[in-house]
Amino acid sequence: NRPQSLLDLGCGYGFLACAAAQQGFEQITATDNNAAALNACTKNFAALEVNGTVISGDAGSQLEERFDAIICNPPFHQGFNIDSELTAKFLTASKRLLAPKGRALFVVNNFIALEKKALDYFPRVREVARSGSFKLIMVSLKG
C-alpha cells in the first residue's frame, strides 16, 4: 500500500522532496519559512521536473491537509546545542499533518535523542537507519 501524498517539512532547498519524487511520489508538498530556501526548492523542482507545490510557512502551520508520508531534516541544533522548542514545533506539526496510517521520517544527527522526545507525540517510534553522523527515525500514529 504505497503512500500517495508526501510533505517535506522544513524543506530547505528541496533535496529530500526531489529524492522522493525520483522514488515515485507524485503528490509532493514542500514548505519552509526561509525565502531563499523556497526559491532554491522551486528552482530544483523545475530543473528536475518535480510535480510539486512549494509553500511558505512556519513548520507547516499554514497546511490543513493530512499526508501519507512526511520527511524532515530539521535544523534542531547549532553545534551541539539542541533547540527543544523547535523540536517540539516540528513534532507537533508532524502529528497534526500525518494521516492516521501515515509515517514520518526524521533525519537527525546521532547525538540528538529525537526518539525519546518523539514518544511524547507518537505511540510508535524507531530508528530505521544509521550512517556516519546521522540516523533516520520513523514515527507513526498507529502503535
Kindly give the residue locations of the regions a language model identified.
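Conserved SAM/SAH cofactor-binding pocket of Class I
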Residues: 1-66, 72
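Short beta->alpha hinge that forms the Motif I/post-I loop of the SAM-binding pocket
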Residues: 32-34, 86, 109-110
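Short hydrophobic/aromatic-enriched beta-strand-loop microsegments
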Residues: 54, 124-130
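A short SAM/SAH-binding and catalytic strip from SAM-dependent methyltransferases
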Residues: 71-81
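A short glycine-rich, Lys/Arg-flanked "PGG" loop and its adjoining helix->strand segment in the class I
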Residues: 88-100
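Conserved beta-strand signature within the Rossmann-like core of class I S-adenosyl-L-methionine
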Residues: 101-107
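Conserved class I S-adenosyl-L-methionine
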Residues: 109-122
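Core SAM-dependent methyltransferase catalytic element
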Residues: 130-143
